[in-house]
Amino acid sequence: DVMVLFGDGAGAVVVGAGDSDDERDGGLYTHAAADGSGAWNLYLKVFDISKSPIVHYDATSKADAENQYPQMVGKKVFLHAVRNMVVATNRALERTGLTWKDIDWFVPHQANLRINEAVVEYKETPKDKALNSIMWYGNTTAATVPLTIDHWRKEGRVKKGDLILSTVFGAGFTWGSAIFRL
């Protein structure tokens, strides 16, 4: 059951040209990728609306439960997430010529703390630069990165002008990275 992993939230990060003459302001790099071969490792079955516009849910029915909740092959999702988030992080650093000395904060997608810890370990990311918030909010899917940045901004750690490297992973499989100045 994956439901214990999920939280509810929304967020956005608006990235644009910087206010200064420094060409390093704003968004420096983005990359997104997809591989549909992982679709059946993390998915939500959808009912056929053409047969019935209303879903009648029976909480005692295993068949109904499979149609209402996300399904996941955890080991495969974990391995793909770690591998692709590491690849996306490497690519971001290589394409920009930046190193961990240049990056103020690493903000991975908050799907699972073990995934984040593995990405940090394999990428040799300085642990004090890695920010997590899953312990407070759960996996809020697309909102995890903005919520994490906002959480640590309110705590006083993340500040305007900080350089952030973010890497993400999602169903299907999809993954990507971005480097931007806050």
For every predicted segment, state its role:
Residues 82, 86-87, 93, 104-182:
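Claisen-condensing/thiolase-fold acyl-transfer catalytic domains that form or cleave C-C bonds
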Residues 1-79, 83, 87, 182:
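Condensing-enzyme catalytic core mediating Claisen C-C bond formation in acyl metabolism
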